[in-house]
Swiss-Prot record:
Residues that bind 3',5'-cyclic AMP 1: 139-260
GO biological process, one term: intracellular signal transduction
UniProt keyword terms in alphabetical order: Acetylation, cAMP, cAMP-binding, Cell membrane, Cytoplasm, Membrane, Nucleotide-binding, Phosphoprotein, Repeat
Similarity comment: Belongs to the cAMP-dependent kinase regulatory chain family.
PROSITE patterns for the chain: CNMP_BINDING_1, CNMP_BINDING_2, CNMP_BINDING_3
Protein's recorded name: cAMP-dependent protein kinase type II-alpha regulatory subunit
Subunit text: The inactive form of the enzyme is composed of two regulatory chains and two catalytic chains. Activation by cAMP produces two active catalytic monomers and a regulatory dimer that binds four cAMP molecules. Interacts with AKAP4 and CBFA2T3. Interacts with the phosphorylated form of PJA2. Interacts with MYRIP. This interaction may link PKA to components of the exocytosis machinery, thus facilitating exocytosis, including insulin release. Forms a complex composed of PRKAR2A, GSK3B and GSKIP through GSKIP interaction; facilitates PKA-induced phosphorylation and regulates GSK3B activity.
Region (Dimerization and phosphorylation): 2-138
Highest taxon of the lineage: Eukaryota
Residues reported to bind 3',5'-cyclic AMP 2: 261-404
Residues modified as Phosphothreonine: T54, T215
Amino acid sequence: MSHIQIPPGLTELLQGYTVEVLRQQPPDLVEFAVEYFTRLREARAPASVLPAATPRQSLGHPPPEPGPDRVADAKGDSESEEDEDLEVPVPSRFNRRVSVCAETYNPDEEEEDTDPRVIHPKTDEQRCRLQEACKDILLFKNLDQEQLSQVLDAMFERIVKADEHVIDQGDDGDNFYVIERGTYDILVTKDNQTRSVGQYDNRGSFGELALMYNTPRAATIVATSEGSLWGLDRVTFRRIIVKNNAKKRKMFESFIESVPLLKSLEVSERMKIVDVIGEKIYKDGERIITQGEKADSFYIIESGEVSILIRSRTKSNKDGGNQEVEIARCHKGQYFGELALVTNKPRAASAYAVGDVKCLVMDVQAFERLLGPCMDIMKRNISHYEEQLVKMFGSSVDLGNLGQ
């Protein structure tokens, strides 16, 4: 085996995925892998110019579309080996639907949303079941409350019987499906031979990649028991989810470029940071970071206002402790919490939400693992770092002592 060479970029690719798994602890590793590598692929080229990926592509290129639209989403140990053998699917032996996704879609071109809303009425009981089925769907995680409500309104229930085909290999994508209950086989036809490459068991989702990239269904999904699915039509899926993902990427990239400490990053480094940034919402008065605690993240304010306070050594509160004194206010586009990452000391101040606040959060462990030691990157702008120290705390202040 000594003649086998590791392809360039493979180690970094797998390290990045491994770090995200350890950080987020997803319940479904395969579903998480599909989401992670889909985002990675989207970041490399606009959706409108992405080629139809073939599973023969190397890891040095945009990853393939795995699965029934996501064969890799299935549970079981066999799919990873079998997926490597998959080639562009041959047309299904079943009748093809009329083409519904031949046109190119570019979310950047649709600035105004004038399409009528799709609403499928539901009983309270149906709504509750739908919310429960969707709570762990990764594609819905970044939607705000209004967007999620629109998605839930547009979803429709589909009851399936055993042996019913939900989607057929080679067909055009028309709906995205979330599984509420039931078991389903994932079948792939190659060289006129059909084989099972995985199963779904009362959870999961499938069908999104054909809608996102205008590619035919890569597998057939057959119900092996009676079950229930929730479908989302292609138009709503692309209007809300695809467009939202594109906007989120642009917004995150824009925020990163606006942070002085990160302006010197290469484009490739910024793209990696986009992948490790999360989003958190804080209510009025909620404490975001605490003075004296170990630093593990830094924050960029997406919306709202944040108050920065330190404990006074000369003023006491009513409980006899050191009173907190406000030293700064941060607003949209500004950031806080990065100094502790550079000094590797406890938090020098506390931060509180003033009104409702939405922050982009970068985890220092993922940051360091993906891009190298945090200090190496921050040193590129060390003069700005020193300027921030003087501005916020005074040149003679020891940050380590402030955290005690």
